[in-house]
């Protein structure tokens, strides 16, 4: 054992010595697998040699090596110089066009003024002109500008067009005289005009303006667009005089495309300084410049000066009136409301609607009656605009004016619109006049008053609504009276007290028709404290009252009436009442879709046991599929033996089986 440990220690020490020796050797003489030294990075010459045959195929290692080589040296002056020299030489070699294009892409990153002569000479050769221009156009400074200007004079065909475009992109101001001379050459006029617009400046703008009048019709829009660009540049440089000259040349020309002329008209107003108001008013007088002029009104005329514009309203086209009304919506109401009001009588639907919308923004109390009148007369979009505007008017004074107008008993159509506004605006102080409107001889007014009460009323208003429902209203009022009673009752926080007023009225009521209507309210309010009252009424001596009570329990919207409808279904001898009770029971069972299926089916079986007619069994079968389980299948199969409901039973079996199969798959 001792000898074994000693040997192990020896080998451990020896292993450490060998490992150290290997590390030292590796540092002193790095080797790779097989004893070969690692390959040295490829030189640029090697990379370009490999790239020279590249034709766009998959094998693109040289492409990426060139990219990495250039990127590694683009911030080093000596490295850039090497890359520039060798890539320029490569551009004149027999390399493939694809390879030269790739090289040119990298040349534009590192090339400087020293590369310009070589690139300029390449521009003279159609075979290399595109690649040379690709690199040259990205070299900043006057040397490259000069080369391109010289090339513009000597190049031909597509190369010349490309050089002109490049000078425009570079915004080479010194090229303007040469480019301007080409505006009269059909083959070059378009690109020359575009280039001058991109260069901008007063000289370029003047050159374009000088050629505009004599330009062919097809070229005029191009020159005009470039003149606009020059004018915008001048405006940005605070040279309003130069900009104005260009705009004044273009704005009177009706032959220009509408967007171009509109821009010229707007620009002329913008560049006119203190004279902008007069220019704008002049443009308002011309139908073809109205739209552009209106778009600048808010920039030129303040609240104290807007009256100058309002005098033009009658002279504007309908389209112009609509646009001006939209602009006036942002002005103080006391300055513009009279002019807006006048347009409410326009024969144009569009103008009237625009006026209504504007009144919603700028109107005050004085706009209440005109808007209510408009809403009462109009239909469709115009009526909707009037109602929206009446609801949008701002301020308590508007609310007070609406109440005042209602108190003056206006025509029924107007009163209806004012009552609608009371509800929309939630004018709670209007409740006295709204309550008074419940006494109106007009059914339309009464209905709108009921709707307004739903928004502003309180449970204390229920007695007045019940008076209308039971004593004064006609059939057209009753549906809204019921809805209003329910809406007011729902505002009572204690759910078990919501039907108190109705129950009190019912207890003292002797008239059958009134009792029936009151009973019909109870399931709509759904206060479960009313169920004992209904149970008692189900045994009343008045058959109509009994029928109403049974129907109320059968229609009860919550499970609180479950046992009541079970008792009805079991005990009643009236077939109609049994059908109603079974239908109510089935509906109540179906209210809880997440109930245990077995328990729900047990209740449905009770309903089936009470059923003696096919109509009643069909109600049960219709609900079975909501609770898929074995018990549901058993009940459906039992009813399958009944010929009168066989089809319904089979449909229930199919639905239950399908749902059970899905549940098995999910599990």
Predicted ranges, named:
Residues 37-57:
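N-terminal "cap/leader" segments of large eukaryotic alpha-helical scaffolds
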Residues 242-249, 278-281, 309, 402-406, ...:
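Alpha-helical repeat scaffolds
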Residues 14-30:
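Bacterial N-terminal signal peptides
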Residues 1-11:
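N-terminal secretory signal peptides that target proteins for export/translocation
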Residues 29-38:
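Basic/polar N-terminal segments that are highly enriched at the extreme N-terminus
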Residues 37-38, 56-78, 89, 93, ...:
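Structural detector for internal amphipathic alpha-helices that build alpha-solenoid repeat scaffolds
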Residues 642:
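Charged (often Lys/Glu-rich) extended helix/loop segments that serve as interaction or gating elements
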């Amino acid at each position: 054992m001792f000898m074994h440990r000693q040997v192990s220690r020896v080998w451990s020490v020896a292993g450490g010595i060998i490992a150290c020796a290997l590390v030292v050797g590796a540092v002193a003489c790095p080797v790779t697998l097989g004893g070969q030294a690692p390959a040295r990075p490829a030189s640029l010459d090697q990379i370009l040699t490999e790239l020279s045959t590249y034709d766009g195929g998959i094998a693109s290692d040289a492409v990426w090596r060139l990219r990495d080589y250039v990127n590694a040296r683009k911030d080093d002056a000596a490295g850039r110089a090497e890359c520039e020299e060798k890539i320029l030489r490569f551009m004149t070699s027999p390399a493939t066009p694809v390879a030269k294009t790739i090289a040119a892409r990298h040349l534009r990153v590192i090339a400087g003024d020293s590369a310009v002569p070589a690139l300029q000479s390449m521009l003279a050769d159609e075979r290399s002109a595109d690649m040379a221009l690709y690199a040259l156009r990205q070299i900043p400074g006057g040397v490259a500008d000069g080369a391109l200007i010289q090339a513009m004079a000597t190049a031909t065909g597509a190369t010349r067009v490309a050089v002109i475009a490049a000078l425009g992109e570079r915004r080479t101001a010194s090229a303007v005289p040469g480019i301007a001379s080409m505006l009269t050459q059909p083959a070059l006029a378009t690109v020359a005009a575009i280039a001058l617009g991109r260069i901008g400046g007063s000289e370029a703008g003047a050159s374009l303006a000088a050629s505009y009048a004599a330009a062919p019709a097809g070229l005029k829009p191009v020159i005009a667009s470039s003149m606009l660009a020059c004018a915008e540049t001048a405006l940005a440089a605070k040279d309003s005089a130069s900009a104005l000259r260009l705009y004044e040349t273009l704005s009177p020309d009706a032959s220009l495309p509408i967007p171009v002329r509109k821009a010229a008209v707007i620009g002329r107003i913008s560049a006119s300084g203190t004279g902008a108001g007069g220019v704008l008013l002049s443009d308002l007088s011309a139908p073809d410049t109205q739209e552009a002029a209106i778009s600048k009104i808010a920039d030129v005329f303040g609240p104290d000066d807007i009256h100058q514009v309002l005098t033009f309203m009658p002279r504007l086209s309908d389209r112009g009136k609509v646009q001006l009304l939209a602009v006036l919506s942002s002005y103080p109401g006391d300055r513009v409301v009279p002019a807006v009001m006048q347009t409410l009588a326009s024969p144009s639907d569009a103008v009237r609607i625009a006026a209504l919308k504007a009144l919603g923004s700028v109107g005050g109390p004085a706009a209440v009656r005109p808007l209510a009148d408009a809403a009462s007369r109009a239909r469709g979009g115009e009526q909707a605009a009037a109602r929206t505007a009446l609801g949008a008017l701002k301020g308590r004074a508007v609310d007070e004016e609406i109440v005042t107008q209602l108190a003056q008993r206006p025509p029924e159509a107007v009163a209806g619109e004012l009552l609608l506004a009371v509800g929309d605006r939630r004018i709670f102080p209007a409740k006295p006049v709204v309550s008074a409107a419940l006494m109106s001889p007009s059914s339309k007014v009464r209905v709108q008053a009921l709707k307004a009460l739903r928004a502003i009323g309180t449970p204390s208003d229920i007695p007045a609504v019940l008076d209308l429902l039971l004593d004064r209203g006609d059939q057209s009022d009753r549906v809204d009276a019921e809805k209003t009673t329910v809406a007011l009752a729902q505002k009572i926080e204690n759910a078990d007290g919501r039907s108190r007023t109705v129950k009190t009225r019912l207890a003292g009521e002797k008239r059958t028709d009134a009792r029936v209507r009151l009973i019909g309210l109870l399931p709509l309010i759904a206060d479960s404290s009313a169920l004992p009252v209904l149970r008692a009424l189900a045994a009343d001596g008045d058959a109509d009252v009994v029928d109403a009570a049974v129907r109320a329990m059968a229609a009860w919207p919550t499970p609180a009436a479950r046992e009541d409808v079970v008792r009805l279904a079991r005990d009643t001898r009236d077939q109609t009442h049994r059908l109603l009770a079974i239908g109510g029971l089935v509906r109540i069972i179906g209210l809880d879709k997440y109930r245990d299926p077995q328990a729900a089916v047990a209740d449905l079986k009770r309903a089936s046991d009470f059923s003696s007619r096919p109509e009643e069994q069909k109600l049960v079968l219709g609900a079975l599929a909501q609770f898929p389980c074995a018990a549901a299948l058993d009940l459906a199969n039992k009813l399958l033996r009944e010929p009168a409901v066989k089809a319904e039973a089979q449909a229930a079996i199919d639905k239950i089986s399908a749902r059970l199969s899905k549940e098995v798959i999910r599990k």
